[in-house]
């Protein structure tokens, strides 16, 4: 396996390298024959999934809760990746799932996830979503007063009380479109008190952008106080949800800082420019379960939760998928430009979703040559196989150790979280990349295609 590095063709040095953290276990698989065999068999790009990593990440979050003596539950944010295998593992382990649409809810239930292990989020939920959520005993995050009335109507029709969290508009982000303001929250609590036959207020939640543990802890502390006030009104109010917002650490600090310091428009195809604020923070010193530990430590939150008897609910997506998958494209052709090349692969940037948020997925792709590599280092951007100028998988002129050739493979690392399928589309009637589940237990590697239930 050959990582991006070195000087490049035509005197261009390419963009500063940004290698993903080493992953010896996955590297051993990529160094073997399997990626090329799968490329031949599937006839196009594909995603590799490692569900054992998903389980380990979830267990790490649960371990932090136990370490802090805090009761809680981890819900996987389903929107982060549509693969069926994550639902299978949540169902078997009894972990929760965060859904925000009727299709997501049906899919989770179809895989055996229990209704009481589902939390339903998102704004202005459709009636069919609320109906099934109430019938199945899901926990519903109520985002608005009119939505609360819809929930009450569904509950009375079903003759079953709805389980709800009231979503708070965070004071630190007053312009968010999510949540109930202070006055609306008081109205909602009073309305729920009048409708005890149709609703159980189990607690509160919020939607908070960003990755600052102290900001999340502060918002969580306010929810604990809201629980105490709600109990005085006769509500159950024994849990809060702090959502996701747990960063993933893709690369080390040195490479990340050098990249931000040195990157400039001539490092990108067509002189494309990116402001550092456009990028996801690909290095985070406090990431994943460690970020939860930081949240619990800030403002004495863990102690406040224990003292108040309040459970902590989490809805991580990307953080549960850290190192749980990668994306593989086959090189279809290479052309030379002034000082760099343009590699065209057999898929599109619709399968690497960061590009469609006016940004760039930055961890270096890894070149898997079909034949023994030789030649000089080579800088190239990577384009998709569509007729769109904007279809760039990598605008950046990546430093490859040798000139890619048709039939070689490019592996984009750590793409399971939000990259694989958030914006996938069969544009040009190109097939959607299949997801290949790897079983690496017991020292052998077996694979199967990811499939929905009953397929």
Where are these regions (language model features)?
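Active-site-proximal loop/turn and secondary-structure-junction residues that shape catalytic pockets
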Residues: 80-82, 103, 124-126, 144-148, ...
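C-terminal active-site-proximal or functional interface alpha/beta core segments in diverse enzymes
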Residues: 209-213, 218-455
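Structural preference for beta-strand elements that scaffold enzyme active sites
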Residues: 73-75, 96, 115-119, 139-141, ...
């Amino acid at each position: 396996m050959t990582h991006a590095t070195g000087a490049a063709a035509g005197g261009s040095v390419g963009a500063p390298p940004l290698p993903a953290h080493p992953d010896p276990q996955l590297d051993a698989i990529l160094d073997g024959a399997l990626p090329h065999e799968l490329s031949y068999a599937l006839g196009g790009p594909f995603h590799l999934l490692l569900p054992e990593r998903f389980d380990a990440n979830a267990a790490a979050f649960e371990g932090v809760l136990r370490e802090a003596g805090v009761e809680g539950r981890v819900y996987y944010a389903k929107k982060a990746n549509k693969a069926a295998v994550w639902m299978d593992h949540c169902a078997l382990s009894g972990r929760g799932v965060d859904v925000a649409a009727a299709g997501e809810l049906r899919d989770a239930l179809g895989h055996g996830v229990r209704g009481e292990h589902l939390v339903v989020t998102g704004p202005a939920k459709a009636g069919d979503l609320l109906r099934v959520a109430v019938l199945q005993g899901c926990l519903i995050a109520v985002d608005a007063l009119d939505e609360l009335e819809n929930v009450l109507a569904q509950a009375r029709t079903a003759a079953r009380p709805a389980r709800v969290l009231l979503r708070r508009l965070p004071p630190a982000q007053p312009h968010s479109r999510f949540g109930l303001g202070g006055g609306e929250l008081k109205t909602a609590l009073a309305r729920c008190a009048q409708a005890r036959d149709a609703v159980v207020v189990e607690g509160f939640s919020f939607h908070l952008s960003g990755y600052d543990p102290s900001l999340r802890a502060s918002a969580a502390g306010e929810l604990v106080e809201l629980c105490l006030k709600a109990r005085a009104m006769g509500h159950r109010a024994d849990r809060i949800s702090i959502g996701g917002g747990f960063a993933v650490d893709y690369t080390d600090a040195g490479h990340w800082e050098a990249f931000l310091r040195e990157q400039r428009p001539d490092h990108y195809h067509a002189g494309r420019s990116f402001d550092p604020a456009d990028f996801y923070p690909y290095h985070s010193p406090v990431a994943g379960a460690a970020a939860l530990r930081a949240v619990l430590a800030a403002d004495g939150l863990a102690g406040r939760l224990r003292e108040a008897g309040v459970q902590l609910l989490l809805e991580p997506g990307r953080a549960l998928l850290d190192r749980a998958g990668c994306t593989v494209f086959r090189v279809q052709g290479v052309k030379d430009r002034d000082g760099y090349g343009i590699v065209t692969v057999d898929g599109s940037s619709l399968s690497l979703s960061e590009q469609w948020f006016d940004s760039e997925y930055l961890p270096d792709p890894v070149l898997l040559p079909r034949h023994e590599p030789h030649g000089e280092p080579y800088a190239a951007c990577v384009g998709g196989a569509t007729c769109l100028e904007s279809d760039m998988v990598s605008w950046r002129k990546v430093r490859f150790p040798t000139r890619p050739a048709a039939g070689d493979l490019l592996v984009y690392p750590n793409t399971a979280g939000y990259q694989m399928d958030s914006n996938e589309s069969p544009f040009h009637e190109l097939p959607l990349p299949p997801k290949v589940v790897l079983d690496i237990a017991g020292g052998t590697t077996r694979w199967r295609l990811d499939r929905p239930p009953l397929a």
